[in-house]
């Protein structure tokens, strides 16, 4: 790790020797010139990123069996133009795009919060066992509680189980992993590194439980569980999307209120304690909120890999670790990553639709590997 010296002077802004990891303004620059330029750079990056994501959303709504131009998409959003275009955009494509945006924002914010409070760049819903816990809960709903729907197709198997019950048990399984981590970490006062390792162990336990449940299931039920784990943005209805948006908004507000705590913890727990921050309370509270946000998305959309891991890393490279800007930038980047992945799902082997989790892994994993190799000397 890079040795950093933090200086705090009365009436001055916090400054560091280097910009490399924290994104704070370098020393030797005036308060107005250096700091204003530092802020302006980050705001410009976030604004450009938001415009790019908006363009991707319009492009996504124009792709499909009925190809539409950007102008046609905009007209259809306002109920004007060709009737077929209006129906396709408003009834099918817009809900899917909104789901991708909300889910991408939620997973990225959760991943950013995990990586901050645990001080571990590999912390995410997958490495903490949250995704695996959700899969275990969904398996119970589809296989045990559905009572053997006898469906002949995977998507029919998912629909034969009560979708509300499936979502509830998936959410319960995801939160069970979180509660176990929080309880065990409080009993033994685990370090952040140990908490991540505990999450990996719980992932193995939930995966084993899912395997055992599938072993005693019928073929159609196993196919239904596998189909659920693929992830699907199209199966989210309006009520579920609204709930996802509300939970995500609450999580975003909580993380925003804790942005200064995240910045202090980024410079070390010792400094955070000296500033009067209860590190353990901040860690546990934000882990719980992040898990609730991620679990809600996974419960409705299925497992979506790498979004919460890659988006914060990319934005940290561009903007540094100032969470005032890293949080919104990660949210926008996550939305863009999931939108691009959803587009690829629909165009690679059209008219077939590929699993969203596979595409996010294919897109996210190479980016993550590149970032690791690029920063290997730091």
PLM segments and residue spans:
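Polybasic, lysine-rich low-complexity intrinsically disordered segments
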Residues: 3-4
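Alpha-helical transmembrane segments in inner-membrane proteins
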Residues: 7-378
């Amino acid at each position: 790790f890079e040795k950093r010296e933090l200086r705090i002077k009365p009436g001055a802004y916090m400054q560091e020797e280097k910009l490399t990891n924290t994104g704070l303004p370098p020393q030797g620059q005036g308060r107005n010139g250096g700091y204003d330029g530092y802020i302006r750079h980050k705001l410009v990056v976030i604004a450009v990123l938001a415009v790019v994501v908006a363009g991707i959303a319009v492009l996504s709504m124009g792709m499909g069996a009925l190809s539409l131009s950007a102008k046609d998409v905009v007209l259809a959003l306002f109920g004007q133009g060709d009737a077929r275009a209006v129906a396709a955009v408003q009834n099918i494509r817009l809900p899917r795009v909104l789901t991708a945006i909300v889910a991408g924002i939620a997973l990225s914010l959760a991943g950013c919060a995990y990586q901050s409070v645990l001080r571990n760049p590999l912390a995410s819903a997958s490495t903490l066992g949250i995704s695996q816990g959700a899969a275990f809960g969904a398996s119970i709903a589809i296989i045990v509680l559905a009572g053997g729907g006898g469906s002949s197709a995977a998507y029919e198997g998912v629909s034969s189980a009560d979708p509300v019950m499936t979502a509830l048990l998936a959410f319960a399984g995801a939160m069970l992993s979180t509660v176990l981590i929080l309880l065990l970490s409080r009993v033994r006062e685990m370090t952040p590194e140990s908490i991540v390792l505990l999450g990996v162990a719980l992932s193995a336990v939930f995966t084993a439980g899912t395997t055992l449940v599938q072993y005693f299931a019928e073929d159609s039920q196993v196919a239904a569980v596998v189909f659920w784990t693929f992830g699907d943005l199209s199966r989210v209805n309006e009520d579920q999307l609204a709930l996802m948006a509300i939970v995500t908004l609450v999580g975003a507000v909580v993380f925003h209120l804790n942005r200064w705590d995240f910045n202090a913890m980024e410079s070390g727990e010792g400094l955070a304690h000296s500033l009067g921050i209860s590190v353990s309370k901040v860690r546990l509270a934000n882990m719980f909120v992040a898990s609730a946000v991620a679990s809600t998305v996974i419960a409705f959309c299925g497992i979506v890999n790498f979004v919460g891991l890659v988006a914060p890393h990319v934005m940290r490279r561009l903007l540094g670790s100032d969470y005032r800007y890293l949080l919104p930038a990660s949210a926008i980047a996550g939305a863009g990553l999931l939108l691009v992945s959803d587009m690829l799902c629909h165009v690679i082997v059209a008219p077939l639709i590929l699993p969203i989790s596979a595409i996010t892994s294919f897109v996210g994993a190479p980016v993550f590997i590149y970032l690791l190799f690029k920063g290997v000397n730091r």
